From Swiss-Prot:
The keyword Isomerase does not apply. Monomer and homodimer. Part of the essential Sec protein translocation apparatus which comprises SecA, SecYEG and auxiliary proteins SecDF. Other proteins may also be involved. The keyword ATP-binding applies. This is Protein translocase subunit SecA. The gene is secA. InterPro entries: Helicase_ATP-bd, P-loop_NTPase, SecA, SecA_CS, SecA_DEAD, SecA_motor_DEAD, SecA_preprotein_X-link_dom, SecA_SF2_C. It is a peripheral membrane protein.
């Protein structure tokens, strides 16, 4: 009703952009008249305007002002370089992204092209722009493909890949626009904040970020934090000795009261899940271990004994854990399921292994961690695009403060979504899928089948092989992943059948009739690879499924036979056949052979790596100007091959359209409606014809867990045959309800992860900011003296009670504590402090500390000028890193323990916040004290070598 009265809010929002679109369209004519050089010089003109604008707010205002002209420039560059012109709706998409929102754009509407607009505009500030994708392949593809537009306009384009060295990373992050995956960005951020020298830092300050497939990164991946951990070298035999000591100690029958120890060696508090040694227990343990002090820092035992006691009393075999195959496996207390691979932290798991006489595995310790939620919130402006965001609108708004706008499609949608078919058993469902695939394949239409697991995709593959239907398999198996792009590029050809597991198939569009541009590049690769690439790489070049030219289009049936019963890897024999739509003319074959000979002369005989060859072919496939004669020759040959292929591909495209376009089959409902919509969105791109259908069975997970019995009893009542499908509105509605339930459940988990990490995040930012200041070496001396002054204040506050008269203050104790930290003040006498007020005491001691520090600096600088600054930096970083690591563990332990406080009517999150804050203040105070102590104790070796 409200919608009728007020109109669609999304439409109202988009209306705002219309006048700007008109401005860009008016500018288009003038900009089209510019030469390439004049168009390129626009970038320098824009950049000049930012020279004296420093503040973020002013830069943003200037960007908004430049937007119409900058967008018009990018549109013209894309026309010249890629032969693609941004539609009006894509300009609106660009504006939505520039404003830091999420744009929902349907599959095939050119999301990747849209991203060029805001990334060019925001790169003009010189602060750098990050474009984030879900995997390395897509990052590389986009950097090569869309990067052409930016390079043509004079911007530098960087790419981050998994195996890059720090120097390469730094160079790529320094570019105007950098393409990377979410995990590479996150891990680089964590590594930068563990660097011990500024030269190791690879990233710049964050400015603007566009995330492709934003739902996948900010929602699906949000539950798992990024963690860098290191193995901790701890003596294994200590665990065993501690377990033996714990076994010999006796538990107290009751807990001590009013500070008086009970009878026995240790007491157990089951509520707090803790064990504490009594004085008697300490003596016994020290005697058994033949040590003088369990807390001796040189040989600490207390931690091991406490863990051994907890393993003995609080961790019960077959309740908290089971022993299986020589390992202690945790049992989840909520579900009762075992959790292989999971381990208790902080040495507790090792204590249990010692108790059970199992092999003790090394401890790991978290060195740094962050969630994607908090990582991406570090960007002052964040934007994202996806085909499906509306179902998660609330979460984007609440967690990330991101609005969602639905961008209209350029052409009206012509896809038909057929009704779901539900079968009684899974085997009946798979037979039905194979039959429908065969039926549609015979009509000459391409079919894409989405499966949920590798196992299921191979089951369907064998069913299709029985019917002799040639098909392509695309799942997480390594041999198939390599060919992902090639397979998807061919999935739109007449009669093509592609089985894809849901991990796959993002990023490459399915073009009806096939992608002639891609086939031409593949042909070139096939011709050049044996001549130019080093054979010892052991890299079997992926070559897509072949077709026989004489069939004039449809896949050759012989392909099925060699696919084997499970459609695994293509046989080597067929791998160099002809996947291509037609054979090339003799002239072109001759031309390619000649090209290969020429390239061998210049680039060497089999001297390149596969990646280098691919990069050169990709560069040749661009339209950007080049002075390189070899790249120009490659470009000419790609164009020549493409022209020949186009003749067949265009005819095939017409045939496929007439037959009804791509048909997409879903074989199971996913936990999230969003993933189902992504699969459907593969058909009917850009107004193409197409159809989709989901096949389900009562044995599918979602139906089984949420209300399958009710439906099963209905089917039994109606005596439905196994092979008879049900099409029912009630069923579809209850499925959607089930999906909503699952989505809400996962949202709550993510929300909780976020709320707890939010507490850590504020602490993380403070620690990392302090660390960065030290790395950059800004005012180190002032910082250390500041630490010292605060330490003096802490000592005064600890030893002086303002409520007592000054003559009762224990100044002797206070002075000896100060001398512990600053041995240079050994002449300080308690008498010098008499008669001073508390504030005067603080000022006097701070003054003494500053003088002592100057003396220390004089001594150290005599050894080698600059050594004092190096020492300051070393000690601060060492202390921050050590204490932060310990703090991370303590916060983990706190998080586990606060959960129980819900029983005491306390909010665990508030308890976590308050205690976490106190622990953080304590950590920072320890860091200051340790640094001051280390600086005064620092004695460089005579050679001038630093001894840490």
């Amino acid at each position: 009703m409200l919608k009728l009265l007020l109109g669609d809010p999304n439409a109202r929002k988009l209306k705002r952009y219309q006048p700007i679109v008109t401005d860009i369209n008016i500018l288009e004519e003038d900009i089209a008249l510019l030469s390439d050089d004049q168009l390129r010089s626009k970038t320098a003109d824009f950049r000049q305007q930012f020279e004296n604008v420093v503040s973020f707010a002013k830069q943003r205002a200037l960007l908004d002002e430049l937007l119409p002209e900058a967008f018009a420039v990018v549109r013209e560059a894309a026309k010249r370089v890629l032969g693609m012109r941004h539609f009006d709706v894509q300009l609106i998409g660009g504006m939505v992204l520039h404003e830091g929102q999420i744009g929902e754009m349907k599959t095939g509407e050119g999301k990747t092209l849209v991203a060029t607009l805001p990334s060019y505009l925001n790169a003009l500030t010189g602060r750098g722009v990050h474009v984030v994708t879900v995997n390395d392949y897509l990052a590389r593809r986009d950097a090569e493909w869309m990067g052409q537009v930016h390079r043509f306009l004079g911007l530098s384009v960087g790419l981050i890949q998994q195996d890059m060295s720090p120097a390469e990373r730094r160079r790529n992050y320094a570019c105007d626009i950098t393409y990377a995956t979410n995990s590479e960005l996150g891990f680089d951020y964590l590594r930068d904040n563990m660097a011990t020298d500024l030269s190791e830092v690879v990233q710049r300050e964050f400015q603007y970020c566009v995330i492709d497939e934003v739902d996948s990164i900010l929602i699906d991946e949000a539950r798992t934090p990024l963690i860098i951990s290191g193995q901790v070298e701890r003596p294994q035999e200590k665990y065993q000795q501690a377990a033996d000591v714990a076994a010999a100690l006796e538990r107290a029958a009751e807990q001590g009261k009013d500070g008086i120890d009970p009878e026995g060696d240790y007491e157990v508090d089951e509520k707090q899940r803790s064990c504490t040694l009594t004085d008697e227990g300490f003596a016994k343990a020290e005697q058994n271990l033949r040590v003088r002090d369990l807390f001796d820092p040189a040989d600490p035992w207390a931690h091991y004994i406490t863990n051994a006691l907890k393993a003995k009393e609080l961790f019960v075999r077959d309740v908290n854990y089971i022993v299986r195959d020589g390992e202690a496996v945790i049992v989840d207390e909520f579900t009762g399921r075992v959790m292989p691979g999971r381990r208790w932290s902080d040495g507790q798991h090792q204590a249990i292994e010692a108790k059970e006489q199992l092999a003790i595995q090394p401890e790991t310790q978290t060195l740094a961690s962050i969630t994607y939620q908090n990582f991406f919130l570090l960007y002052p402006r964040l934007a994202g695009m996806t085909g499906t965001a509306k179902t998660e609108e609330v979460e984007f708004e609440k967690t990330y403060k991101l609005e969602t706008s639905v961008i209209p499609t350029n052409q009206p949608r012509a896809r038909a979504d057929w009704v779901d078919q539900v079968y009684k058993t899974e085997s009946a469902k798979w037979r039905a899928v194979a039959n429908e695939t065969a039926e549609i394949h015979k009509q000459g239409r391409p079919v894409l089948v989405g499966t949920t697991s590798v196992e299921k995709s191979e089951l369907l593959s064998s069913l299709l092989s029985e019917q002799e239907i040639p098909h392509n398999l695309l799942n997480a198996k390594p041999e198939n992943v390599e060919r992902e792009a090639e397979i998807v590029a061919q999935a739109g050809r007449a009669g093509a059948v592609t089985i894809a597991t849901n991990m796959a198939g993002r990023g490459t569009d399915i073009i009806l009739g096939g992608n002639s541009d891609y086939m031409a590049r593949l042909k070139l690769r096939e011709v050049l690879l044996p001549r130019l690439v080093r054979p010892e790489e052991g890299h079997r070049p992926p070559v897509p499924l072949q077709r026989a030219a004489e069939t004039g289009g449809g896949f050759a049936a012989k392909a099925a036979a060699s696919n084997g019963s499970h459609g695994h890897v293509l046989s080597e024999a067929r791998a160099i056949g002809s996947l291509y739509p037609c054979s090339l003319t003799d002239d072109t074959d001759q031309f390619l052979a000649e090209l290969a000979r020429e390239l061998v002369k210049v680039w060497g005989d089999r001297a390149l790596s596969v990646i280098e060859l691919e990069d050169r072919i990709s560069t040749a496939a661009e339209k950007a100007p080049t002075d390189d004669a070899q790249i120009a020759a490659l470009r000419e040959s790609i164009a020549r091959v493409k022209t020949e292929y186009d003749v067949v591909v265009t005819q095939e495209e017409v045939r496929v359209r007439e037959a009804g376009g791509l048909h997409v089959i879903g074989t199971e409902r996913h936990e999230s409606r969003r993933v189902d919509n992504q699969l459907r969105g593969r058909a009917g791109r850009q107004g193409d014809l197409g159809s989709t259908r989901f096949f389900l069975s009562l044995e599918d997970n979602l139906l089984r867990i949420f209300g399958g019995e009710r439906v099963a009893s209905l089917m039994n009542a109606f005596r439905v045959e196994e092979d008879m499908p049900i099409e029912s509105g009630m069923l579809t509605r209850s499925l959607e309800g089930a999906q909503k339930k699952v989505e809400t459940y996962y949202y709550d988990i993510r929300k909780q992860v976020f709320e707890y990490d939010e507490v850590m995040n504020n602490q993380r930012r403070a620690v990392y900011a302090e660390r960065r200041r030290v790395l950059e070496g800004r005012g180190l001396k002032k910082q250390v003296i500041g630490y010292g002054e605060r330490t003096m204040d802490d000592i005064v506050e600890a030893y002086v009670n303002p409520d007592l008269p000054p003559e009762e203050w224990d100044l002797g104790q206070l002075v000896s504590k100060v001398q512990q930290f600053v041995y240079l003040l050994e002449d300080l006498k308690p008498e010098q402090l008499q008669g001073l007020s508390m504030e005067e005491l603080k000022s006097f001691l701070q003054e003494q500390l500053r003088n002592a520090y100057d003396i220390k600096e004089g001594q150290i600088e005599q050894q080698r000028p600059g050594l004092m600054r190096e020492a300051e930096r070393f000690f601060i970083l060492q202390q921050i890193d050590t204490l932060w690591r310990e703090h991370l563990q303590a916060m983990d332990a706190l998080r586990e323990s606060v959960g129980l406080r819900g029983y005491g009517q306390k909010d665990p999150l508030i308890e976590y916040k308050n205690e976490g804050y106190d622990m953080f203040l304590e950590m920072m105070a320890n860091m200051r004290r340790n640094v001051i102590y280390s600086m005064f104790m620092f004695q460089p070796a005579a050679s001038g070598q630093e001894q840490a």
